[in-house]
Amino acid sequence: MVKIGINEFGRIGRLAFRRIYEL
C-alpha cells in the first residue's frame, strides 16, 4: 500500500509539481 502510494505520487506528483512550479 505504501509502496504503491509513493510510486503513484512520484509520477503524478512530479508532473503536478512541475506545472505549479512553472506558474
UniProtKB/Swiss-Prot annotation:
EC code: 2.4.2.4
Protein name: Thymidine phosphorylase
Enzyme class: transferase
Gene for this chain: deoA
Naturally occurring in which organism (per UniProt): Lacticaseibacillus rhamnosus
Biological role: The enzymes which catalyze the reversible phosphorolysis of pyrimidine nucleosides are involved in the degradation of these compounds and in their utilization as carbon and energy sources, or in the rescue of pyrimidine bases for nucleotide synthesis.
Keyword Transferase in annotation: yes
Phylogenetic lineage: Bacteria, Bacillati, Bacillota, Bacilli, Lactobacillales
Keywords per UniProt: Glycosyltransferase, Transferase
Any one GO molecular function term: thymidine phosphorylase activity
Reaction(s) catalysed (UniProt annotation): thymidine + phosphate = 2-deoxy-alpha-D-ribose 1-phosphate + thymine
Protein family (similarity comment): Belongs to the thymidine/pyrimidine-nucleoside phosphorylase family.
Membrane-crossing residue ranges in chain numbering: none
Oligomer and partners: Homodimer.
Gene3D superfamilies: NAD(P)-binding Rossmann-like Domain (3.40.50.720)
